[in-house]
């Protein structure tokens, strides 16, 4: 029944998006939404600091006129996912509801205190000092190499707790190594010894109706065979399956449909973060949008280890 409702909603939103005019004037600070131009600026900032993310065009017939042809959406491929969500130790103490007084019951952050998605707490430490000069401290090993070339100053910010993410010098994961590792584990015997590593392709598009970024993902098994929808749901927080996360067609690519994190709450969450930064005497630049966006959607896909800023300063 929920799938039917999501399908009907999806079709209605497609029509609404088509009829919605393109946002021309910036309303980022007031409402948390962004223009297509601001989306491109934030995307350029993400690509600069995390080169595993790249701009893409998609199908020619699906190019959106309000975005540059070569910058229709962002993509990162072969992102590792080492375990299923049910394998993560759950505790009520780790759960938090963001904006719980809204009609939908709020955004559930299942791993709120683990350091994976502590963005709303961390931004309280941001100050006015060097607020316009931002750089990453630990996006990944590759991002660190990029930072060696950056000479801009940046004020320190309290580091997030490490979440046990596997560091790698590779921009993308070599799935052949995963297969070899799986075979070795299988030979060792025992179901628990098997490395159940999957990989995901992630995409960020601009949603004209909600005027925010939108995250899409599609997964593969160890043999690089596409995962079924039910298998992909295993890597998504169960608080968000079929609610925040639905199955829809990518706006720039051909089928099959992908999992998508619905953007209806993105502007609200971003507005809350902007206000929190302002309360601390800081100012959040729109070019930081996607770095922070990737931070808070990690609550939805906590085991997919994509390239984003775990440590950043302002």
From Swiss-Prot:
Record-listed cross-link Glycyl lysine isopeptide (Lys-Gly) (interchain with G-Cter in ATG12), residues: 243
Residues covered by region (Disordered): 143-163
Effect of residue 173 to A: Weakens the ATG3-ATG7 interaction. Significantly reduces the thioester-linkage formation with GABARAP
Motif stretch (LIR motif): 104-110
Impact upon substituting residue 264 to S: Instead of the formation of an intermediate complex with a thiol ester bond between ATG3 (E2-like enzyme) and GABARAPL1/APG8L (substrate), a stable complex with an O-ester bond is formed
GO annotation, cellular component aspect: Atg12-Atg5-Atg16 complex; cytoplasm; cytosol; phagophore assembly site
Main location: cytoplasm
Outcome recorded upon mutating residue 167 to A: Weakens the ATG3-ATG7 interaction. Reduces the thioester-linkage formation with GABARAP
Record motif Membrane-curvature-sensing motif, residues: 4-19
Effect annotated for changing residue 156 to A: Strongly decreases affinity for the complex ATG12:ATG5:ATG16L1. Impairs interaction with the complex ATG12:ATG5:ATG16L1. Impairs phosphatidylethanolamine (PE)-conjugated ATG8-like protein formation
Enzyme class: transferase
Residues the UniProt record annotates as site (Cleavage): 169-170
Renumbered ranges of motif Increases ATG3 translation efficiency by the ribomome assisted of EIF5A: 101-103
Ranges spanned by the short sequence motif Caspase cleavage motif LETD, renumbered to the chain: 166-169
Molecular-function GO term, any one: Atg8-family ligase activity
Family matches, as InterPro entries: Atg3/Atg10
Purpose of the protein: E2 conjugating enzyme that catalyzes the covalent conjugation of the C-terminal Gly of ATG8-like proteins (GABARAP, GABARAPL1, GABARAPL2 or MAP1LC3A) to the amino group of phosphatidylethanolamine (PE)-containing lipids in the membrane resulting in membrane-bound ATG8-like proteins which is one of the key steps in the development of autophagic isolation membranes during autophagosome formation. Cycles back and forth between binding to ATG7 for loading with the ATG8-like proteins and binding to E3 enzyme, composed of ATG12, ATG5 and ATG16L1 to promote ATG8-like proteins lipidation.
Subunit structure: Homdimer. Interacts with ATG7; this interaction forms an E1-E2 complex that is essential for the transfer of GABARAP thioester from ATG7 to ATG3 and disrupts interaction with the E3 enzyme complex. Interacts with ATG12; this interaction is ATG7-dependent, essential for phosphatidylethanolamine (PE)-conjugated ATG8-like proteins formation and also mediates the autoconjugation of ATG12 on ATG3. Interacts with FNBP1L.
Domain description: The N-terminal region works in concert with its geometry-selective amphipathic helix (AH) to promote LC3-PE conjugation activity only on the target membrane.
Protein name, per record: Ubiquitin-like-conjugating enzyme ATG3
Native source organism of the sequence: Homo sapiens (Human)
């Amino acid at each position: 029944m929920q799938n039917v409702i999501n399908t009907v909603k999806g079709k209605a939103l497609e029509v609404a998006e088509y009829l919605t005019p393109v946002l021309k004037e910036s309303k980022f600070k007031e409402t948390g939404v962004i223009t297509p131009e601001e989306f491109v600026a934030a995307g350029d900032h993400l690509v600069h600091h995390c080169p595993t993310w790249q701009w893409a065009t998609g199908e020619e017939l699906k190019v959106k006129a309000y975005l540059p042809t070569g910058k229709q959406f962002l993509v990162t491929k072969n992102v590792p996912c080492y375990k299923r969500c049910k394998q993560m130790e759950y505790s009520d103490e780790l759960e938090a509801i963001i904006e719980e007084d809204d009609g939908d019951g709020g955004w559930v952050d299942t791993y709120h205190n683990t350091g994976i998605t502590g963005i709303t707490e961390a931004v309280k430490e941001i100050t006015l000092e060097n607020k316009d000069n931002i750089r990453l401290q630990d996006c990944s090993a590759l991002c660190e190499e990029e930072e060696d070339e950056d000479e801009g100053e940046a004020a320190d910010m309290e580091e997030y707790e490490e979440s046990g993410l596997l560091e790698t010098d590779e921009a993308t994961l070599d799935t052949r190594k995963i297969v070899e590792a799986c075979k070795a584990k299988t030979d060792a015997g025992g179901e628990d010894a098997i490395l159940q590593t999957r990989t995901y392709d992630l995409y960020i598009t601009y949603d004209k109706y909600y005027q925010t970024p939108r995250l899409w993902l599609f997964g593969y098994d160890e043999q690089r065979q596409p995962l079924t929808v039910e298998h992909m749901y295993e890597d998504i927080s169960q608080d968000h399956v079929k609610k925040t996360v639905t199955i829809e067609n990518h706006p720039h690519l051909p089928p099959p449909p992908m999992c998508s994190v619905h953007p209806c709450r993105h502007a609200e969450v971003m507005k809350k973060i902007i206000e929190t930064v302002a309360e601390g005497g800081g100012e959040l630049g729109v070019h930081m949008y996607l770095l922070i966006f990737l931070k808070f959607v990690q609550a939805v896909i906590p085991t997919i280890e994509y390239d984003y800023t775990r440590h950043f300063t302002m």
